[in-house]
Every structure is written in structure tokens, then in C-alpha cells.
Amino acid sequence: MDSPSAGYTFEYLIETLNGNSQKKFFNVPKLGGTKYDILPYSIRVLLEAAVRNCDGFLMKKEDVMNILDWKTKQSNVEVPFFPARVVLQDFTGIPAMVDFAAMREAVKTLGGDPKKVHPACPTDLTVDHSLQIDFSKCAIQNAPNPGGGDLQKAGKLSPLKVQSKKLPCRGQTTCRGSCDSGELSRNSGTFSSQIENTPVLCPFHLQPVPEPETVLKNQEVEFGRNRERLQFFKWSSGAFKNVAVIPPGTGMAHQVNLEYLSRVVFEETDLLFPDSVVGTDSHITMVNGLGILGWGVGGIETEAVMLGLPVTLTLPEVVGCELTGSSNAFVTSIDIVLGITKHLRQVGVAGKFVEFFGSGVSQLSIVDRTTIANMCPEYGAILSFFPVDNVTLRHLEHTGFDKTKLESMEKYLKAVKLFRNDENSSEPEYSQVIQINLNSIVASVSGPKRPQDRVAVTDMKSDFQACLNEKVGFKGFQVAAEKQSDTVSVRYDGSEYKLSHGSVVIAAVISCTNNCNPSVMLAAGLLAKKAVEIGLRVKPYIRTSLSPGSGMVTHYLSSSGVLPYLSKLGFDIVGYGCSTCVGNTAPLSEAVLNAVKQGDLVTCGVLSGNKHFEGRLCDCVRANYLASPPLVVAYAIAGTVNIDFQTEPLGTDSTGKEIYLHDIWPSREEVHQMEEEHVILSMFKTLKEKVEMGNKRWNSLEAPDSVLFPWDVKSTYIRCPSFFDKLTKEPAASQPIENAHVLLYLGDSVTTDHISPAGSIARSSAAAKYLTNRGLTPREFNSYGARRGNDAVMTRGTFANIKLFNKFIGKPAPKTIHFPSGQTLDVFEAAELYQKEGIPLIILAGKKYGSGNSRDWAAKGPYLLGVKAVLAESYEKIHKDHLIGIGIAPLEFLPGENADSLGLSGREVFSLSFPEELFPGITLNIKTSTGKEFSVIASFANDVEITLYKHGGLLNFVARKFL
């Protein structure tokens, strides 16, 4: 399917830029006059795209007029949007490209031309989520050799041998593991449960590795472990038009999107238009800080955009956020982010655009803005937009942007009134205006279980103690008063330490949110420098790591001279990509694990990301806090979160003098000076060279050269999915859901991590059994995220999260009841039995079903389990779109009702029918086997969603377009 022809209806608006016939644009302000002038900047971008793509079919003149009349039409109409480009990361990119490959097969089978199946817009796929930390500071973990790759071919790692003497770890006293093999035996059990039949030298290390080699070794293993996936990506870049793959080791999707792919203004042939983007990564919103409209959507919707269809959204309300005042000296952009997050959550901006204006905006750098914009999914907004202004232009100039293009960009943006100027006499009109005084924001962290639970650093000690007292919940651990002062001794690396409630055991500056912000990274480095120089250290049992977003972070930390000091404190670079943040953390030492279990301690992880859903880091780490990078370092030095930084010292110097946090906290002037000297130009130049040159391993990787992908039936990574098995040229009539059983009875805030985990594959899981039956050992399982190209693994991994709370079971476990037999089984095993019996399934849930990361397998998995509908109190929008996009009906209880109020136990049998004529918000009647009947709302927002559902989902709908 070709993309729509531009401007059929509004060709008369095309003008040349300053008389240059090679630079044309749609002069949209002429269309609306004063109506245009009061539009928020973000809505002006939507309007330009509508005008440019108006062909009377996919984009109608009525849609354009609705956007122009935003003031009266907001929240009341659906509008299409054609983004300029698409960005994928590999965790969600691989199922998207596998679906494309499978669609080619289906189109050919039904007599169509498979060559027509390719993206209609530029699509960039960044391989950034496959990194796992096999090699850390002091040694090499025995890395897996999965069925999909050969580690010896990938990196020719030297054989691992048992040694009878202590391994010479760099720094000796700062080794992160107990490396005295004399105290351990092969059968002692002091090694990771994910590593079998390997020499036991220390809990998670084997060979000593110099720091620079650590990154290379992790990359070697990454290429070996993911060889099949990488070959498939390389085939995709050659087989499909408009697909470019950014290879491993380059950086994260949102990082590369911001620093390399972003154009601000597109110049296609002779036409100028605003850059805009959608992608399968929730952090895609980061680019809004650069004045580029963009947000995260599901993999299924992204595929539709790639095939030339628009994204459809309700014309959003736009909340104007006026920033005033100046930030305090000790406040980082992360504190500003968390302050805005809490404020916007309280105001309520779900499903809305947020647009920033006011005098305070000009005081924020681009990296500050992108950090704020990156967090918008956490407060529920679709996006948070910072219009282009002089700060943006200066940033682009410093990053080496071509000056001629920069001049054209400025002229174009001013011509179409997309350039924000503090001297403007009037601001756009907004649906609502809120004010935030930057001076009122104080340093804070977020936790212990949810990112929205913000805690001022000054209140941290009292808040943690309150959490110990509270009943088990989002802010409670219910530790008996007489147990709260308990300590447990742990012997580590020849020394004795005490663990207690609040002890920090994981401290990670990870590759999410913060690494794009040089100021906070440099602040962490400066803090480390001052700490080391004054004699402070991190206790060796704390699992510390530094996982940068891209190579330029390493560059500026190194060139500024702070990297060695971070290393001295244990924050060594372990690789480039998502690791700790997606559950790929290396295990803690056995000594620490035993101590935690012995004392039933509430130990803590402190990380500089933006997500910390329960159980994500490590099962034994019950409290997890989000903090700015310098605070991560500070809490690591303190060794506990149960501390008042204002009144209690971090430690003592060599003379015994007490050292407080304010003694080593870097000033904003120090940070900004270092940022200017070591960051701006070189970091972007480095990434550009890295992306364009690739790397030796990627460049030498062989891939098939064919229109159709040659599926390997033995592959455990890439498999042709079954979504198109029953595809016909015409859709069948909607079928009723009759005599359905409830597969799971869930509560509130069920996340996509609960539904479709991205981390490691547990040995006892259904997915593990599948892989074992195909000859793989536990060391070769890899992660669910890495195996999203295999529908058999992902279906078995659906609802396999150990933290899943199913009310049928009464405790966290990936289990359910198969009611016909009364057996308690793994969720997959129960669903498999139901399918053999021909019994359809539904899911009962509470509020905010499907919250968290955008993850299309959280819909695909239940679909392949046989789930026909989900009945919940409310949904996360992206996940609801996914359910419709795969053919699952999203049903909602009537306002004020839920399963409890209706007296449902979940053990009933449910039946409902769909009328031939569906419409948005239609009420349906459900009958149960007990005789009880009740009404629910079919949560379809528009006719497009209804059409997709009738086709059996978006994939079937799109595939039929090629026939």
C-alpha cells in the first residue's frame, strides 16, 4: 500500500520559502487566520500533517476542519495523523518485522504480491534491548550459548577454568564478588540459579576483566546470543524499503532518536514539513523536548503506520503548563521531572497533550526538556511538548547541525508560526492552564514500589520507617516493630558487614531517562570525584553498575575526567543498552541473598531510571527507589536509604571528620561548565560516525537475500506466527462469545510486565519446558524480550510473571484454576486445556488494566491463549488499542460497578453477543450460568476500531488491503 498523495484538497496553500522554488511548504496559517493563531503549537503540527496528507479518503477535509476548530471539537472527534517517520526498538521491533514477514507469506498464499508489503514511511529499528550484563566489573560470568548463536564464533572467548587461588580482581578490595575459591566448592550452591554446570569461583564472576574489555565482552556475547535475531534484522533492512537498522552497541532507541534521527524539519524532495514520529517505545516522547511531535504507540498500530495508514486519536485536550521562577541550586532536572509528574498526576492529564510555556521554559536546556518530556507516560499524558525556540536552535548549532539547513528551518518554522518566542504578546489558548514555580521544587526520589510515589529527600528516612510500619501495599511492608532494628551479619571479601532494613544492595545508573541528560550524569561523576578524593567508598557487596544510553556518555564522562572516580566507587560501564531497567540484572552474591532471607530484610535498590515495578530488579529486593544519578551514587556511599542527609553523615574522611552530602554535592556552575567543555559537540559527532560506520561484527554478519524470509523450523528465536492461519479474503461475521470461562481474576494496576514479562525465563515456566524440549539448557534460554519473534515462547510466557496476583489462587503466582477439572495449573497449561475443550476465555480485571510499558505481546499472548474479551473497570489506552488491534474485545463495567459489586466470583460461565451494527460506546448484555445478567460497555472509541475488530484485528485488516 502506497502512502497517500499529499495535498489534493489544499494544494492552493503551497508556497515557496523566500522565493526559493526548491523549498516549498504548505502555508497552513492562511487556512485559519485567527483560529490558527490561538491553536496550541502541538495542534498546529497535527493540522499541518492533515493538510499535507488530505486525499479525501484516509484524510478527509472534514478531519482538517475538525483540527482547525480544535477549541470546540477537542475530546469530541477522532482525527487521523500521518507521522513523518517510525522508530522501533528490537524488543517490539522484532515482532513487528516478523509480522511483516508473515504477512508477505499470507499475501502470497492468497494470490497477492508480497513485494507490496513494505513500510510506506522511513522506519528506523534500533537494536538496543538485547544487552544483558554477563561481564561486570571484576570478572566474566559464564555466558549462555543459545540455540540461536555460537559464542565461540562470535567472540572466541577463552575457556573458563577453575583456579585454586584468589582471582586478581582490579582494585582487590573493591571486588563485587567473593572470589576466594578456597571457601567454595562446586556443590556449594553459591552461584546464580541461571548458571549451571560451571566452575564456582564467586557468586556471579569467573574471569577478571579490565574495564574497557568488559564492554567488548558483553557485546561479543550479545552478538553470539542474538545471532538469529540480528540476521533477521539485517534481512529486513535489505528486503523492505525504507527500513534502516541501527546495530547493537550504538545506543538506545529513544537516545538515538533524539541525537541522530531527529530532523526537527523534514525536507523531502522540495517540500518542507515538521518532523514527527511514533514508535514502539514509550520513551519516544523524549523528542517533544526538541519540538518534535511524537509519542509511543503499540507495535500493531506502528505496523499500520508503516503500511501507509494513519494513527487515529481523539482530538486531544491540551493542558498548558506555565513554568515560572528558577530552579534551586541543588535540584536536578530529575527533581523537576518528578515534581511535574506528581503535579500533573494530581491535576489529571491522562489522554491529553501537555504543552509548556512561560518564562521558566527558557531557563531549561534541551536536555532538561527532553528529560521532562520523556517522563510524560508516567503521568498519563500522550505527550509533553516544548515548541522550538532560540534554546532549541542554539542546541542544534552546538551539535553540529548544518548552518544552511538551520537557517531554512528557522525561516520555515517562523513562516508557519511554529516558533515560540518569549516576546510574543499572547500565548495560545489551552484547554486548561496550570502553573508550576520551579523554585518550589525540592530534591526527591520516588518509591518504594511505584514511580508516582514521590518522596522528598529530606523526608526519606521518616517515609521509609513509615513504610516498614504500614500494611503490605504500594507504600507498606508491615514489618513488626520489634523486628525493624534487626541486623544480619554478612561476611564479604574477607570483611564483616551489617545488613538491615533499608540497606542498599543494588545501585544502578541505568540506560533509561537520565543518560541523555549530561548535567545529571556529570553531576554524578563530580560527586564521585569529590567522594573519592575525600576518602569515601561504596561497600563491596552492593551491586553497582553504569549502563550508558550510548557511547557518547562514555566519551564525555571520560573526557571530563570523572569516569575513573565512578569506577573507584564500583560504577563501571557494563554495556550500552537496556539492562537493569528491563530486568536483565546480574544476581546478588549468595552471602547477601542468605543474609536478606535470614533476616527477612527489606533491602533496597536505587536506580536512575523511570520505572521500578515490583519484582523487576530482583525478587529479594523489596524496596526500589528512582533517583537522579548523583543521588544514586550518594545512597550507594551511604549504604542505606534509612538516612537523613541533612543531619547524618555519609561517612568520615581519613582524619575521622564526618562528611555530609552537602560537602561533596557539585554546584550547578561546576556542572554547566563541564557540560559546555566536554559534551555538546563531540557527543553528537561521535554518535553520527558510529551509526553511519556500523561495527565490524554487524558489517560482517551474513543475512538471506530473498523476498520471503526462509523460516528455520529448528529456530527458537524466529518463527512464523499463527496470526494469519485463518485469514480469508473477506472478514467473517462477528461471532458471539458463548459459555466462556474466566482464565484469570485480576485486581487493579495489572501492568504489561505482569501480562508479558520482558526479563529472564524461569526454569519452571511453560516457556522453559518448551525450550528444554528443543534441546536448550537454562543458560541458553535468554529473555522473553529476546524471544518475541517466537510466538510459541511468548504465548507460554504470557501471565508468567511471579508477581501476578490471581484472586483464584490468593497469592502471587503465575497459576490459575482449570474449572472443568478443578486443577491448579500454570496459566498456559490451563489455557491449552480450555482450547482443546473448545471453551472460549475471558479475563476479569480492575482499574488500569495494561498499565506500564507499551507491549503488543501483552495483547497477542492472551489472544493466542484463546482469550476473546477482557472485562475491566478501566484500561491503559495503548493496551486497549492493542487488544482491539489483535481482535480481543475490551469491555468495561458500567461506572460505579465492578466484579465485587455485581457479586461475581469468576467461577461463572459467561455469554454475550455482538449486534451486527456496532457503534462506539455500545452497551452489551452479559448472561452468566448462575442466571445473573448485567450490562457492560464495549470500549470502542470510533468506527475505525470497530472495523478493525470486525476484521479480527489490525493485521488481518491490513493484509486484506494487499489482496
UniProtKB/Swiss-Prot annotation:
It comes from Mus musculus. Its cofactor is [4Fe-4S] cluster. It holds the Pfam family Aconitase. The lineage of its organism: Eukaryota, Metazoa, Chordata, Craniata, Vertebrata. It comes from the Eukaryota. This is Iron-responsive element-binding protein 2. The gene is Ireb2. The keyword Ribosomal protein does not apply. It is found in: Cytoplasm. One of its GO terms (molecular function) is iron-responsive element binding. Belongs to the aconitase/IPM isomerase family. Interacts with RBCK1 only in iron-rich conditions. Interacts (when associated with the 4Fe-4S) with FBXL5. Interacts with CIAO1 and CIAO2A. Ubiquitinated and degraded by the proteasome in presence of high level of iron and oxygen. Ubiquitinated by a SCF complex containing FBXL5. Upon iron and oxygen depletion FBXL5 is degraded, preventing ubiquitination and allowing its RNA-binding activity. GO terms for cellular component: cytoplasm; cytosol; endoplasmic reticulum; Golgi apparatus; mitochondrion. [4Fe-4S] cluster binds at residues 512, 578, 581. RNA-binding protein that binds to iron-responsive elements (IRES), which are stem-loop structures found in the 5'-UTR of ferritin, and delta aminolevulinic acid synthase mRNAs, and in the 3'-UTR of transferrin receptor mRNA. Binding to the IRE element in ferritin results in the repression of its mRNA translation. Binding of the protein to the transferrin receptor mRNA inhibits the degradation of this otherwise rapidly degraded mRNA. Transmembrane segments: none annotated. Binds 1 [4Fe-4S] cluster per subunit. [4Fe-4S]-binding affects RNA-binding activity, thereby inhibiting activity of the protein. Its main location: cytoplasm. InterPro entries: AcnA_IRP_Swivel, Acnase/IPM_dHydase_lsu_aba_1/3, Acoase/IPM_deHydtase_lsu_aba, Aconitase/3IPM_dehydase_swvl, Aconitase/IRP2, Aconitase_4Fe-4S_BS, Aconitase_4Fe-4S_dom, AconitaseA/IPMdHydase_ssu_swvl. GO terms for biological process: erythrocyte homeostasis; intestinal absorption; intracellular iron ion homeostasis; multicellular organismal-level iron ion homeostasis; osteoclast differentiation; post-embryonic development; protoporphyrinogen IX biosynthetic process; regulation of gene expression. Keywords: 4Fe-4S, Cytoplasm, Iron, Iron-sulfur, Metal-binding, RNA-binding, Ubl conjugation.
